[in-house]
Amino acid sequence: MTNQAPIPVIVNGAAGKMGREVVKAVAQAPDLNLLGAIDSSPEHQGKDAGELAGLSEPLEVPITNQLEPMLGYVAGERQGPPGVIVDFTHPDSVYDNVRSAIAYGIRPVVGTTGLSPAQIQNLADFAEKASTGCLIIPNFSIGMVLLQQAAVTASQYFDHVEIIELHHNQKADAPSGTAIQTAELLAELGKTFNSAIVEETEKIPGARGSLAEEGIRIHSVRLPGLIAHQEVIFGAPGQIYTLRHDTSDRACYMPGVLLAIRKVLQLKSLVYGLEKIL
């Protein structure tokens, strides 16, 4: 039994669907302490984060839209380990959120997708200069990591592959960060996929999906009723090999989120992807 003080945690995007799950998971973890709950939505200001997340008892942590004061408050807590902020916000704000957190010495765990490669590199440089750990994780599901590993193995034997990602219609960015990461992992093999057999003509622009690295196509679907789903489809003469991961409940991401909160304290730079800390 350890007597170490719990890790102070801020949840940014606490009123969102993922944010509420994170609030519940953090509140139920004995080694974590929810100190702040940030959200920009006016209708949730002042509400108790625990009650909003569906917990039976209030946490006495009110929702606020004041990020910088909360970062300063947690940074000023000199007892125990450094603070961690979990960000599930919006592609338009996540870059500034992460820079602000690092500037205060707060370790970011980022689940928000939509950051450009240039933004990720800038954050990596900033985190390294500050010797501050930062995790950017497109998908916190252990099952998705296993799918990606299986896809990398399969891509050694198949020359044709396409990715289909399906999400709820409130997701702002496309393709998903997970689909982009999957394509990047396949592209690391250094082979070119999907060499054209015929000269293709798109009668409607975008009909063949977006073109990622090394000829890999990504198709995005946005519909109500979906949460998060991905297929990686390999083809060869006479056969199709399909890998698929389906999310039926956002609770499946919480083991990965909690692992990331604990692991980010051990880092001195930015790390991209859940597979790097498993």
Curated annotation (Swiss-Prot):
GO terms for cellular component: cytosol. The active site is at H167 (proton donor/acceptor), K171 (proton donor). (S)-2,3,4,5-tetrahydrodipicolinate binds at H168, G177, T178. Its EC number is 1.17.1.8. GO terms for molecular function: 4-hydroxy-tetrahydrodipicolinate reductase; NAD binding; NADP binding; oxidoreductase activity, acting on CH or CH2 groups, NAD or NADP as acceptor. It comes from the Bacteria. Its main location: cytoplasm. The keyword NADP applies. Pfam families: DapB_C, DapB_N. PROSITE patterns: DAPB. InterPro entries: DapB_C, DapB_N, DapB_N_CS, DHDPR_bac, NAD(P)-bd_dom_sf. Belongs to the DapB family. This is 4-hydroxy-tetrahydrodipicolinate reductase. It comes from Nostoc sp. (strain PCC 7120 / SAG 25.82 / UTEX 2576). The gene is dapB.
